Amino acid sequence: MRKKELFDFTNITPKLFTELRVADKTVLQSFNFDEKNHQIYTTQVASGLGKDNTQSYRITRLSLEGLQLDSMLLKHGGHGTNIGIENRNGTIYIWSLYDKPNETDKSELVCFPYKAGATLDENSKELQRFSNMPFDHRVTPALDMKNRQLAIRQYDTKNNNNKQWVTIFNLDDAIANKNNPLYTINIPDELHYLQGFFLDDGYLYWYTGDTNSKSYPNLITVFDSDNKIVLQKEITVGKDLSTRYENNFREPEGICMYTNPETGAKSLMVGITSGKEGNRISRIYAYHSYENFMNHVPMLRSPLLKTVGHQDTPPERFQPFIQTFILEYNAQNKKWMVPTSGYLPSYTSNLVRNITINADGNLQVTLNERYISLLHQSIEGDFRLKQKDIRMGSWYFAGGEKSNVLEIGFMKGSTKIRPDDAAISNASRMSIFMIVADKIEV
């Protein structure tokens, strides 16, 4: 098999790609992209099923902005540890495992068409099973659709020895139920705490680590087809600026390579779940290629250097980038919102988390991410607002713990007014423009 160019993510600073509005309240297990239709598919353990809870999972279909479109339920289908997405003549097929009845240490490889609102179980006729694939242990799949290859991870649950291996097949052979393995990658014992894996251009991306990296560090390890480790990096994304986790919980969940269907540019995506039980927050962070970074995050090309007098060590480097969005007023609902016609879908809608009016009568805009340093900020009202002599201003946060909360006050003439004052016309808009900076990881 011809090797393609390795995507080296180790010197790239990750950026938030999206926050996922998934169907269930449990921890994210995995995610995958339908690149042709610009959609994301996620898996979670299904809640509310009583004793079946730990053996069923839910698939959610979302937009690239992380907005939930629909979902389906797989009863007795395991945890949804990892899935593959196949676009077959316009129909999306899910590759997954299904537990074998009465054999808790074994599972079968299956694929089935995604159907919004459906519930499947082990007896559903929609499940295509692959009986000629000789899997004696539990299996987990991943797909490389560019090269039409299937990766099957197996692990030995009988002997408690943490043995895991991944076998690569031609996808069309697998669909035809033919057992023609191409090669196998043996996973070192110390990398057994799996949180996701993905196959791309002959390289296996292996994602490991436990909650808060307590016993096992959060690592991405990349293997080539010769069973050699070619890249490895510890992943620290998901901490806030004080190096804490939201509600002191952080768990790596899912990994996927996104390839722009038009340009071929790549982004390595990793999932992180944080927050308290019953209200988990699931986010995807991106290690973008330069081409994809330019498409998703408006940036300034020249990094900033932090220097303090004479330094014997290289100065810290900071990357300035732009955060900008438009807000529109709905007079009927008395709410400000990001207008659907006024944003870049891959960027702005992921920037704003929520918009409220706080106890001080100011508009409070909560962003998804904090920043290290605020370099510039301006708020500009449109003609409707200026015609009525309504102006806006904010309380600056130079950066840090509260930098994701933007508080905007309103004035009419010399009098302070509320953001939902009757003087504000329907469809009035304002533009918020900020230049901020984050530290460049090394």
From Swiss-Prot:
Taxonomic superkingdom: Bacteria
The record, for InterPro entries, names: P68_RBP_TagC-like_b_propeller
Which Pfam families does the UniProt entry name for this protein?
A: Phage_RBD_prop (PF21311)
The record's Gene Ontology biological-process terms are: cell wall organization; teichoic acid biosynthetic process
Alphabetical keyword list:
Cell wall biogenesis/degradation, Teichoic acid biosynthesis
Q: What does this protein do?
A: Unknown. Might be involved in poly(glycerol phosphate) teichoic acid biosynthesis.
Q: Could you identify this protein by its name? A: Putative major teichoic acid biosynthesis protein C
The species this protein was found in:
Bacillus subtilis (strain 168)
